[in-house]
Amino acid sequence: MSKLFIFFLLVALLAFVSSEAAECVAKGQNCIVGKSTCCIGQCIIKDHVLGSCE
């Protein structure tokens, strides 16, 4: 794979993660401030895999 392809893949992944995090916060599941046990990564995983971020 070319370095350019890998670069675009990383950019796309970053954009996806940030949009997911924004959606998570918008739903009232504030991953950064309100819930110390629910950082952004955990929030995305729990919300999509377990159906809850609590």
Curated annotation (Swiss-Prot):
Question: Which GO CC terms are listed, alphabetically?
Answer: extracellular region
Signal peptide boundaries: 1-21
Expression across tissues is: Expressed by the venom duct.
Q: Which domain of life is it from?
A: Eukaryota
Give biotech applications. Potential candidate for insect pest control through ingestion. Feeding leaves coated with this peptide to neonate D.saccharalis result in increased mortality and significantly reduced feeding compared to caterpillars fed untreated leaves.
State where the protein is found: Secreted
Cysteine pairs bridged by disulfides in the record? 24-39, 31-43, 38-53
Q: What is its main location?
A: secreted
UniProt keywords (A-Z) are: Disulfide bond, Knottin, Secreted, Signal
Quoted from the entry, the domain comment is: The presence of a 'disulfide through disulfide knot' structurally defines this protein as a knottin.
Q: What else is known?
A: Highly abundant in venom.
- The protein here is known as H-bracotoxin-Cf4
Described function: This endoparasitoid wasp peptide has a role in disruption of the cellular host immune response, since it reduces the capacity of D.saccharalis hemocytes to encapsulate foreign bodies. On the other hand, it shows no effect on the humoral immune response, since it has no effect on phenoloxidase activity.
